[in-house]
Amino acid sequence: MSIEVSNESGMDVSEEELISVARFVIARMDVHPAAELSMVLVDSATMADLHMRWMDLPGPTDVMSFPMDELEPGGRPDSPEPGPSMLGDIVLCPSFAADQAEKAGHPLAHELALLTVHGVLHLLGYDHAEPEEEKEMFGLQNQLLDDWYEDLRRAERDAALAARDQKLLGKAGFFDAPDQ
C-alpha cells in the first residue's frame, strides 16, 4: 500500500499519523493491499479555491476527496490490471481543521485523523447527502477511528511489556539487558 503525503499548508503536521490512520482504514475496509492514495495538505486560500471550483461553495472547508472511480459504499477499487489501484486524492486544510478542533475541544491531531478517515470513506463510495447515508458513514467513521486508537493503545502496551520483559530477562541472565 502506497500513501504519499504532500504538506503544502505551512503547518507542522504529523504525516506519519495521517499515513497510519489512512493505512488502518484501507486495510480494515479490505481494500487491495497494492492500493495507492495521495494526501495533500493545503492552506485556507487553496482550499477555498478548490471548494469553489469543485463544489461551487464559497470559503474553505476541512476535507475534500477526489476518487479515481465512482464506487458504491463499501465498494472495492480492485483494478483488473496487475499492479496498484489508485484510490484517489484527499485534500486536508489543517488551519480550518485547527479551528474545528478548538471548537470541539480536542487536539488538532485528532481532528486530522477524523478527517482522514472521512476522506478515505468518501474515496470508497460513502457519502452523507441523505440522512440514512449520513448515519451509516458517520457510524462507520467513528467506529474506525475508535478501532485505530485502540490499535495504537494496544501497540504501546505491547511495546511497554516487551521492554519490561527484556529488562527482566536480561537481569535473569537470559540475554544482555539494555542500558538503564
Curated annotation (Swiss-Prot):
One GO process term, biological-process aspect: rRNA processing
Purpose: Single strand-specific metallo-endoribonuclease involved in late-stage 70S ribosome quality control and in maturation of the 3' terminus of the 16S rRNA.
Compartments, record wording: Cytoplasm
Pfam families, alphabetized: YbeY
Cofactor note: Binds 1 zinc ion.
Cofactor: Zn(2+)
EC number(s) given by UniProt: 3.1.-.-
InterPro entries given in the database record: MetalPrtase_cat_dom_sf_prd, YbeY, YbeY_CS
UniProt-recorded name of the protein: Endoribonuclease YbeY
Binding site for Zn(2+): 118, 122, 128
Keyword Cytoplasm in record: yes
Xref: HAMAP family: Endoribonucl_YbeY
Organism listed in the record: Rhodococcus opacus (strain B4)
Family (UniProt): Belongs to the endoribonuclease YbeY family.
PANTHER family referenced in this protein's UniProt entry, alphabetically: ENDORIBONUCLEASE YBEY, CHLOROPLASTIC
GO cellular component, one term: cytoplasm
Transmembrane segments: none
Gene Ontology molecular-function annotations: metalloendopeptidase activity; RNA endonuclease activity; zinc ion binding
UniProt superkingdom: Bacteria
